[in-house]
Regions:
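Hydrophobic packing and interface segments
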Residues: 1-395
Length: 395
């Protein structure tokens, strides 16, 4: 190639660099003509910037692939040996990543966007009480995994078919090329949320709060979309990471027909569930501490509600800061400790068979990956759907 044989190494970085520049261009295309724009108009403006960035990255990728790669190169396919791959097939793998990223944005918007069928269903179910609200929200989060996981499966399979493990890596690189745009869209949510809080606390004109509510409802969707991209990139790179793991440990593969490996697969599947439970429990404990502190201040400091006394803000900040650090200690230790424990126990039980221990750890990682992706999609979309269902009532 034109780079002394390192073109395939430089290509992902070149696409990422082009993606940053293109994302900056995309932000200038996010424009709203009316000061009284509704949710659909705001979402459309953000989509214009996002979709333009994705299309331009696709065009840039085509040029970079043809410039930086040789006409043909050899790629290894697991169990099939080396095969000749054309530069065009690498571009097809890159295109897979972009298309899947765009599709994930669309599906996430559908499941979490204000006025969409899933949100309207949650609103309707809420008319009969909290129980049916919870059922509808859980069902929305669960059904949203269907489209996302199918997209991940298609992306992994097709990108591998086009260019082997390199194709999978290129698909992930292309998907993350618009990270700058995705982060901007993701950050839009909390910025709009905090702006609404400031508007309410500073007694701004009611129309200001109405407009920030519109931005906030769109922000709930964009935040879910940004997290969806992060989940997708993790899922898409799983095959490449397992290939690197197999190469590094010098094992033939991860055979789940072996009892210890299958056992660790189930253990890995359990960890994201327990992690989620611990994280939710931590939030509950921190919230209880905060509520008790606020109640104490209302009781002991007269005049807070009338605005003539100053609350002790530092106490609330101290509670949230300490709780966020202290309560996440156990979930963090769980994720770090289990892999170490598996290796230690494996070496003690099979001191002469280190390859089996490596397979056990690989089985654990496979379980974590599959379970973690499903739980991440479910919680991300269910949370966004509930949040915008709440906005529907407030509106």
């Amino acid at each position: 190639d034109a780079f002394g044989g390192i073109g395939p190494i430089l290509l992902p970085m070149a696409i990422a660099g082009a993606g940053i520049i293109i994302s900056i261009i995309g932000t200038f295309l996010v424009k709203i003509s009316s000061n009284d724009a509704k949710e659909a108009e705001v979402q459309k403006a953000l989509n214009v910037g996002n979709w333009t960035s994705i299309i331009l990255v696709g065009l840039a990728s085509f040029g970079l692939v043809n410039w930086m790669l040789p006409e043909t190169m050899q790629m290894e396919f697991y169990g099939e040996g080396l095969q000749d791959i054309s530069a065009l097939r690498v571009f097809y793998a890159t295109l897979v990543g972009l298309v899947v990223g765009a599709a994930i944005s669309s599906f996430t918007e559908y499941y979490t966007g204000l006025g969409k069928t899933p949100i309207l269903n949650i609103v309707q179910q809420s008319s009969t009480g909290a129980a049916t609200n919870i059922i509808a929200g859980l069902a929305t989060g669960m059904i949203s995994t269907f489209s996302s996981v199918l997209l991940f499966a298609i992306a992994i399979w097709s990108s591998y078919a086009f260019a082997g493990f390199y194709g999978v890596a290129m698909a992930a690189s292309a998907m993350m090329a618009t990270t700058a745009m995705q982060l901007a869209i993701d950050a839009f949510g909390p910025i709009a949320d905090n702006a609404g809080g400031i508007a309410e606390m500073s007694d701004q004109n009611p129309i200001v709060r109405e407009r920030t509510d519109i931005l906030d409802s769109v922000g709930n969707t964009t935040a879910a979309t940004g997290k969806g991209f992060a989940i997708a990139s993790a899922a898409l790179t799983a095959l490449a990471l397992f290939a690197a793991y197999v190469t590094f440990t010098e094992i033939d593969g991860i055979n789940i027909f072996k009892a210890p490996v299958l056992a660790m697969l189930f253990v890995g599947g359990m960890v994201p569930v327990v992690f989620s439970a611990l994280a939710m429990s931590s939030v509950g404990k921190a919230a209880m501490e905060m509520v008790e502190e606020v109640r104490r201040q209302f009781k002991e400091i007269p005049g807070i509600m009338e605005g003539i006394a100053k609350p002790e803000y530092d106490k609330c900040v101290d509670i949230s800061t300490k709780a966020s650090l202290r309560q996440m200690l156990l979930p963090g230790l769980l994720t770090i400790g289990f892999p170490i424990l598996i290796v230690v126990v494996g070496v003690l039980i099979y001191p002469e068979n280190h390859k089996l221990v490596a397979e056990m750890l690989g089985g654990y990682m496979a379980g974590v990956t599959v379970s973690g992706v499903l739980w991440a999609i479910f919680q991300n979309n269910a949370g966004g759907a509930w949040d915008n269902a709440k906005k529907s009532f407030e509106a």
